[in-house]
Amino acid sequence: MRNIKLIIEFDGTNFCGWQRQVKDRTVQGCLENAILKITGEKSLTNGSSRTDGGVHAKAMVANFITNSSIPGEKFREALNTKLPDDISIIKSEEVDMEFHARYSSKGKMYSYTIVNRYEKLAFGKQYLHHVRKELNVEDMKKACEYFLGKHDFKAFMSPGSSAKTTVRTITDFYIEENKNVIRIFISADGFLYNMVRIIVGTLINVGTGKTKLQDVNNIINDGIRKNAGMCVPPNGLVLEKVFY
């Protein structure tokens, strides 16, 4: 028995998320089909994140147990010959049997990309969120500071979560701006269901002036979902890195 770790890049546009489903196309389903083709084994993969449909990844981590004699580093090339064009294995290696892509994780980094311009977009919409109203990016940057540290993020969670606790620690949160392209980066020890997308929606409210900068701390502390921003679309969201 061997434990194989994979680092995976995928374009989430045409997937119904990571987690396997009976009828819908998912990243996990395609990956497990590829493993079956090269090993002859029905392996169950563990993913570091359960991304939603439309969410992308530059470095999703997964692992699976196999009896195959294929060298760990060779799974990358072998799997890539069986995977669709919107999934790529960046790295593969054999790891200790104790390693688990999800439960061994110490944190994750996500990015979210916004294009802020009045004119409609002709292309690239599957990788970003278009905001037409002018955003005050300096206020958005200041708002990031309120989220840093350990907080109860109940106000930033969509219904349907099975999380045992809504307390999380955000370790890094910053914005990069290049002309009308705004990239938001957020790292934490874990994220609640739709937490990143709702936090970004709250930042957009700050940027448009709908939410006052000084009210952000109250939104966090009050824990009332309706006081936070909208859950922005998934297409601007990218899993950048998983920490171990």
UniProtKB/Swiss-Prot annotation:
Gene Ontology BP term (one): tRNA pseudouridine synthesis
UniProt xrefs under InterPro entries: PsdUridine_synth_cat_dom_sf, PsdUridine_synth_TruA, PsdUridine_synth_TruA_a/b_dom, PsdUridine_synth_TruA_C, TruA/RsuA/RluB/E/F_N
Gene (UniProt): truA
Quaternary assembly: Homodimer.
Residues at the catalytic site: D52 (nucleophile)
Gene Ontology molecular function, alphabetical: RNA binding; tRNA pseudouridine(38-40) synthase activity
Keywords assigned: Isomerase, tRNA processing
Designated name of the protein: tRNA pseudouridine synthase A
EC number per UniProt: 5.4.99.12
Reaction(s) the record says it catalyses: uridine(38/39/40) in tRNA = pseudouridine(38/39/40) in tRNA
CDD domains: PseudoU_synth_EcTruA
The protein's role, per its UniProt record: Formation of pseudouridine at positions 38, 39 and 40 in the anticodon stem and loop of transfer RNAs.
Family the UniProt entry places it in: Belongs to the tRNA pseudouridine synthase TruA family.
Pfam families, alphabetized: PseudoU_synth_1
Residue sites binding substrate per the record: Y110
Coiled coil: none
